[in-house]
């Protein structure tokens, strides 16, 4: 019996039935009625109750199915009155008694005899009524446990389906009671139940704490034992589904499979080699093998079979190209230069690339080359082709080994450039392009005479268009890292052949030729002037043709013309600049569609022209900037979608789908990507034009940069917005020359927003950008530009960032983990970068508050001290840098904090880690330089330790040089500050003098050569002794030549050295200089003239 009035039931039934009508008009009326009359604050409870009853009890399967789907959709939908579309749900806002009624109906329907498809939909609806933010529902768990014992497999499958969505239903139950449930599911006679059980098991596994994982390990053999039966029975889909679940488990706990790893390798090998299976089964088997390398690389390296198997199966899959097309006729005629339709081949390439990146050449190169040597001599062209593509895929990951074998690799590859089969030629071009990137710039310097002629030979009309295009693309890779001097001898041949490609009747060939010419021009720089007069008129002629069908070609022409202009310089470009600008203005004013590729090319071309013309570009800003402002003001285009729609949306590159609070949210990412591009271009114009851009600053800041920090669904938008802020401020300052009221107001809004972001930003990479923007903004605004409230908020933000970083690093670097390996090098890198930016932001605040910030810093001192006492070098270095900054900018005011860090700092002077020694030495130096009274009792006693640092046998090695030079500068600072108070000062001075030259650390060099100059001026016998003058001169010349000391900074010491040389006979002075080669002597004449 219904809980609703008959009239409500009758009205809503008519609406739901109308939803099933084939008549669009009837459906539209029903949708409107439901939306306007029932999805309201007053009626949503009636509607959800009705839909639950119909899903559970209606004998009309169409009405029941529609009701279940609508119920789930509306349960997830945010209430009409809610402003939190993504977080709020109707199901959590209805009254408890209504929720209880709905739950009762759905559960009764689930347990009754219903069609299998209806029960599936009911299980999805039930799952939405048991989310963790709803009251407990103990009856459900008992019902599911009973259903899992049912003789009807659909009951069992649907029960596991619910547990998949809400695994926490059983996490509170004793694990020993749960194990038999999954054991039974894994051995179920029904394939669908097995799959549902495995999927539910993964969800349950994710919910459990690590301490319980070992208890689940006993189930894994049963899970894996289900796989051979699927294979034997030809159940490809089931096999793929279980592999997908296993992949999730491997990503969580790879070492849980350690004892079964050999069996997994053998079974996946069998599946991948079985070409009778559908591609999804084979590719998911390969993915399972691949994720082991990404999550347990050491386990893979220690297994003899893993590398051999992985290499063998990927090579086999890479031969699966041009099936039933031995001459590759279809491939040759295809205009689509991607090979993604060759699914197994594409998966294999990606897999080998990923595994190589994780395991490296020491492990993978040997098994790979064992097969490659055989394959390149095979009579089967597919094997020769696969060998080339495999080498391309593995090159980056194996670079540690292969970069030393370039001649041998080229001996193997280059003969195949003239292979009879075009796909092998293509593969050869691919290798040459790939290694030109992966082994750059070394390979450009050492092998240009082999690579460039080989690629140029494939640009000729004797080759197929696909090969010509790929050779041209490989030349882009080579040019990107080649100097103009390397390219110059080949330019005639390159340009002659590329101009021929421009005459091709195939659009994609023309487009690639233009891209290659553009990159070569960019690399060749002024060497390209010779070809300017031939190429620029050709490009302009293409741009003048009014044809909307070749917008990409026009875009490539713009790109090419502007890159050539940039290469040859403003003066030469002037000959055609006005003509090109007129064409671009006409295109800008034409009706270009939103999704036309020409729009992006046009925007980038204007940016390059601005780089060429500088301030002469300003008159064009009213034409160029308004469209960018429109794109940059785009809002977040998001929408709630059904789970069934998610796969469709994910097929489109313009959209992304994320899951938040059980909801599927579609994000129109292409709009946001365009927004980022527009913001980056605005940043480019602002950087180039400074004060000339000031007219746009207020609008860009208030309508683009600051609102972008709230774009929580696109990291790039937030990063671009934060980066824009200090650049906009500098434009306004450049225009006015003073800090006017508008500038101060904008800074206050921007800095408050950035500081607030330090607390709320979830991504460490973006937090890093916020700190960087604060530092750059403070540089623009100067002293005391943050209020007391902002300083307090900044301190809280830094504290939160440090706490989060520390916890992340503890999680990754904790004690041995029996389930995972510590492999998060990328995350370490991110955290190191973040800590570096926090160091800079703390320093900026300390510097501009004249020590006033010290009292705020005391609030985060406990966290800094935790870092200081940790064993992780990154954390210790962060703390040491903070200490150095607080002494530099706080000076004698730091006396009260002295005892909190000095014992650890002096201990760090003898650390085995050179980076820590460097930071500690720097601190001792700033103690003497900025707070000599407070730290005299620290600095003088450390002199002997500092001398040991600069004097030990490996002190001048590359890895130790920075720490040595900082210790050297610290000695100089102590000698300068405490000269008369130091016993044996001349001995220490002599020891210091032996540390010169200082050629790596610019800050250390600056002080060391100031001190050297002072010693000379004071006629110190240590440096002024005739026997030492040659060493003095040499140390100064080396510092200037290595640019650790700029010519401007070096004027004082150069002047002192000249004075010192004046004491020598001119012949002796010239003898000192004459030992230098001609290139250095040319500089010496300039420095010492």
UniProtKB/Swiss-Prot annotation:
Xref: Pfam families: HEAT_EZ (PF13513), Importin_rep_4 (PF18808), Importin_rep_5 (PF18816), Importin_rep_6 (PF18829)
Misc: Present with 15500 molecules/cell in log phase SD medium.
Modified residues (Phosphothreonine): 830
Functional summary from the UniProt entry: Functions in nuclear protein import as nuclear transport receptor. Serves as receptor for classical and arginine/glycine-rich nuclear localization signals (cNLS and rg-NLS) in cargo substrates. Its predominant cargo substrate seems to be ribosomal proteins and ribosome biogenesis trans- and cis-acting factors. Required for nuclear transport of YAP1, NOP1 and SOF1. Mediates the nuclear import of histones H3 and H4. Mediates docking of the importin/substrate complex to the nuclear pore complex (NPC) through binding to repeat-containing nucleoporins. Plays a role in protein secretion.
Subcellular location: Cytoplasm; Nucleus
Residues modified to N-acetylserine: 2
InterPro entries in alphabetical order: ARM-like, ARM-type_fold, Importin_beta, Importin_rep_4, Importin_rep_5, Importin_rep_6
HEAT repeat intervals: 6-39, 44-78, 96-129, 138-165, 175-207, 216-252, 260-295, 304-359, 361-395, 399-439, 441-481, 484-524, 526-568, 571-613, 615-689, 692-735, 742-781, 788-849, 852-890, 898-930, 938-978, 986-1017, 1028-1063, 1066-1089
Cysteines paired by S-S bonds: none
Organism this protein belongs to: Saccharomyces cerevisiae (strain ATCC 204508 / S288c)
Transmembrane annotation, as ranges: none
Keyword Cytoplasm attributed: yes
GO molecular function annotations of the record: nuclear import signal receptor activity; nuclear localization sequence binding
Protein name in the entry: Importin subunit beta-3
Gene name of the encoded protein: PSE1
One biological process term in Gene Ontology: regulation of protein desumoylation
């Amino acid at each position: 019996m219904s809980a609703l009035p008959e009239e409500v039931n009758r009205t809503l039934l008519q609406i739901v039935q109308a939803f099933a009508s084939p008549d669009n008009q009837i459906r539209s009326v029903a949708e409107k009625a439901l939306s306007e009359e029932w999805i309201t604050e007053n009626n949503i409870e009636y509607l959800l109750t009705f839909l639950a009853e119909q899903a559970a009890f209606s004998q009309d399967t169409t009405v029941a199915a529609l009701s279940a789907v609508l119920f789930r959709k509306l349960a997830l939908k945010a209430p009409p009155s809610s402003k939190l579309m993504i977080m709020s749900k109707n199901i959590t806002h209805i009254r408890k008694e209504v929720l209880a009624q709905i739950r009762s109906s759905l559960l009764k329907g689930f347990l009754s005899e219903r069609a299998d498809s209806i029960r599936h939909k009911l299980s999805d609806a039930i799952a939405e009524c048991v989310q963790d933010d709803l009251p407990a529902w103990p009856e459900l768990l008992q019902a599911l446990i009973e259903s899992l014992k049912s003789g009807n497999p659909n009951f069992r499958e649907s029960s596991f389906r619910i547990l998949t969505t809400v695994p926490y239903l059983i996490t509170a139950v004793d694990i020993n009671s749960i194990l038999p449930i999954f054991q039974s599911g894994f051995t179920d006679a029904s394939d669908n139940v097995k799959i549902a059980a495995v999927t539910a098991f993964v969800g349950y596994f994710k919910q459990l704490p690590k301490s319980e994982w070992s208890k689940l390990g006993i189930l894994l053999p049963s899970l894996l034992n289900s796989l051979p039966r699927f294979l034997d029975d030809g159940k490809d889909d089931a096999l793929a589904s279980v592999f997908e679940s296993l992949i999730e488990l491997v990503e969580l706990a790879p070492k849980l499979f350690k004892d079964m790893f050999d069996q997994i390798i053998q079974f996946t090998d069998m599946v991948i080699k079985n070409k009778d299976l559908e591609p999804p089964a084979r590719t998911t088997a390969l993915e399972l093998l691949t994720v082991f390398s990404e999550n347990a690389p050491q386990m893979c390296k220690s297994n003899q079979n893993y590398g051999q198997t992985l290499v063998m199966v990927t090579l086999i899959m890479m031969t699966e190209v041009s099936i039933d097309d031995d001459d590759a006729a279809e491939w040759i005629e295809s205009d689509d230069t991607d090979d993604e339709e060759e699914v197994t081949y594409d998966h294999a390439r990606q897999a080998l690339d990923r595994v190589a990146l994780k395991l490296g050449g020491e492990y993978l190169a040997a098994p790979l080359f064992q097969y490659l040597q055989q394959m390149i001599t095979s009579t089967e062209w597919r094997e020769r082709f696969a060998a080339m593509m495999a080498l391309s895929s593995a090159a980056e990951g194996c670079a540690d080994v292969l970069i030393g074998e370039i001649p041998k690799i080229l001996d193997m590859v280059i003969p195949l450039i003239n292979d009879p089969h075009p796909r092998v030629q293509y593969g050869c071009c691919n290798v040459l392009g790939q290694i030109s990137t992966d082994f750059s710039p070394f390979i450009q310097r050492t092998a240009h005479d082999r690579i460039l002629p080989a690629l140029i030979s494939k640009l000729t009309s004797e080759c197929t268009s696909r090969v010509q295009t790929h050779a041209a693309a490989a030349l882009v890779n080579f040019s990107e890292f080649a100097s103009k001097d390397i390219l110059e001898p080949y330019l005639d041949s390159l340009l002659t052949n590329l101009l021929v490609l421009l005459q091709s009747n195939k659009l994609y060939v023309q487009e690639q030729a233009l891209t290659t010419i553009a990159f070569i021009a960019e690399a060749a720089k002024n060497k390209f002037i010779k070809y300017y007069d031939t190429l620029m008129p050709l490009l302009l002629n293409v741009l003048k043709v009014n044809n909307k069908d070749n917008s990409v070609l026009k875009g490539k022409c713009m790109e090419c013309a502007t890159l050539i202009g940039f290469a040859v310089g403003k003066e030469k470009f002037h000959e055609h600049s006005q003509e090109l600008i007129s064409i671009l203005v006409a295109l800008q004013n034409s009706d270009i569609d939103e999704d036309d590729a020409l729009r992006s090319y046009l925007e980038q071309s204007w940016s390059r022209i601005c780089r060429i013309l500088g301030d002469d570009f300003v008159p064009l800003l009213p034409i160029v900037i308004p469209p960018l402002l429109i794109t940059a003001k785009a809002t977040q285009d998001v929408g709630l979608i059904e789970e069934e729609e998610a796969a469709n949306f994910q097929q489109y590159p313009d959209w992304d789908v994320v899951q938040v609070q059980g909801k599927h949210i579609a994000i129109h990412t292409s709009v946001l990507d365009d927004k980022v591009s527009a913001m980056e271009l605005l940043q480019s114009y602002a950087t180039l034009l400074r004060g000339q851009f000031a007219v746009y600053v207020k609008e860009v800041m208030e309508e683009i940069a600051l609102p972008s920090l709230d774009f929580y669904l696109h990291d790039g938008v937030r990063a671009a917005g934060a980066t824009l802020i200090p650049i906009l401020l500098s434009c306004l300052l450049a225009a006015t020359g003073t800090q006017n009221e508008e500038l101060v107001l904008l800074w206050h809004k921007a800095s408050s927003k950035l500081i607030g972001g330090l607390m709320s930003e979830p991504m460490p990479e973006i937090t890093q950008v916020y700190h960087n923007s604060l530092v750059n903004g403070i540089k623009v605004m100067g002293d005391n530009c943050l209020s007391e409230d902002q300083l307090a908020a900044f301190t809280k933000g830094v504290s939160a960032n440090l706490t989060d970083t520390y916890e992340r690093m503890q999680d990754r670097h904790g004690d041995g983990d029996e389930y995972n390996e510590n492999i998060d090098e990328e995350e370490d890198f991110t955290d190191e970068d973040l800590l570096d930016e926090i160091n800079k932001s703390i320093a900026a605040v300390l510097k501009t508050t004249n020590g006033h910030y010290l009292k705020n810093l005391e609030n985060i001192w406990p966290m800094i001290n935790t870092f200081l006492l940790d064993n992780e070098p990154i954390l210790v270095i962060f703390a040491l840098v903070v200490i150095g900054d607080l002494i530099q900018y706080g000076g004698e005011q730091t006396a009260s904090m002295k005892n909190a860090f000095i014992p650890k700092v002096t201990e760090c002077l003898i650390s085995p880690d050179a980076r820590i020694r460097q930071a500690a030495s720097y601190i001792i130096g700033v103690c003497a330089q900025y707070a000599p009274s407070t730290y005299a009792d620290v600095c003088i006693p450390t002199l002997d330790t500092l001398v040991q640092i600069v004097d030990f046998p490996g002190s001048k090695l590359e890895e130790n040089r920075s720490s040595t030079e900082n210790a050297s500068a610290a000695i100089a600072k102590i000698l300068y500050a405490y000269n008369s108070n130091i016993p044996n000062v001349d001995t220490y001075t002599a020891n210091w003098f032996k540390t010169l030259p200082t050629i790596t650390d610019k800050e250390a060099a600056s002080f060391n050569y100031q001190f050297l100059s002072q010693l000379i001026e004071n006629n110190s016998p240590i440096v002024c002794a005739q026997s030492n003058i040659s060493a003095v001169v040499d140390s100064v010349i080396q510092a200037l030549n290595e640019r650790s000391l700029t010519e401007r900074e070096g004027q004082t010491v150069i002047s002192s050295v000249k004075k010192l040389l004046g004491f020598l006979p001119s012949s002796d002075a010239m003898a000192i200089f004459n030992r230098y080669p001609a290139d250095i002597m040319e500089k010496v004449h300039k420095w010492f003239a």
